[in-house]
Amino acid sequence: MGTRAQQIPLLEGETDNYDGVTVTMVEPMDSEVFTESLRASLSHWREEGKKGIWIKLPLGLANLVEAAVSEGFRYHHAEPEYLMLVSWISETPDTIPANASHVVGAGALVINKNTKEVLVVQERSGFFKDKNVWKLPTGVINEGEDIWTGVAREVEEETGIIADFVEVLAFRQSHKAILKKKTDMFFLCVLSPRSYDITEQKSEILQAKWMPIQEYVDQPWNKKNEMFKFMANICQKKCEEEYLGFAIVPTTTSSGKESFIYCNADHAKRLKVSRDQASASL
């Protein structure tokens, strides 16, 4: 019995800083063979004091899901090309982090300062379909995408307008908003247009136009829905130059990765000046 256990090949995995192991399955494997290797590997990892065991299964190895679940694994998250399962094998409390809990969205207040008009759209589908509501261009920030670049991308995709990010004006948090489970973080941003001729994204946008800010604010929908009323008020104050938002300050993490801090626009300017002066003195 012991000799047979020694002959069973263990699954190869990459250890992490939290006494965990991630197994990335690549080669096709019979589910019974996989079960034997998994059992032997789990026994080995317990002896080593490992805690969280992750198994990454590509679409082509979906036949191994049932076997993994039978050995105590549970779903953690899925992407288009793989499923991630996890099992906590330690006697200590389970500290496996939850799956991603938030989706980040952004709305764009694009201001034409010459005419005091803002860019608005009517959508072909979704919540606002057939409601005759003119709304700001909005969209979801992609994985690995910064808020300030994502909101500009959405504006160009929906309207053809090229615009530069200026500030984050406000943000709101809404629970159970995505798939009745995930939390939606929505950032209201102001952008400055570099072009003014509109080309609607026919697949999503019914029509788009430049609208006087007061007309946007006075829409019945904005009047009767408090959250939209507050957002519209912030937009109006920004158009009247009576509101200061959060600008970006480029920086780097301790590992050298590029990152951005969002802070009061006035203070952001001071931080940039201070950094430039320090760089000039080197």
From Swiss-Prot:
It is found in: Nucleus; Cytoplasm; Cell membrane. Keywords: Cell membrane, Cytoplasm, Hydrolase, Magnesium, Membrane, Metal-binding, NAD, Nucleus. Induction: Rapid and transient induction by biotic and abiotic stresses. Not induced by H(2)O(2). Gene3D superfamilies: 3.40.630.30, Nucleoside Triphosphate Pyrophosphohydrolase (3.90.79.10). Its cofactor is Mg(2+). GO terms for cellular component: cytoplasm; nucleus; plasma membrane. This is Nudix hydrolase 7. It comes from Arabidopsis thaliana.
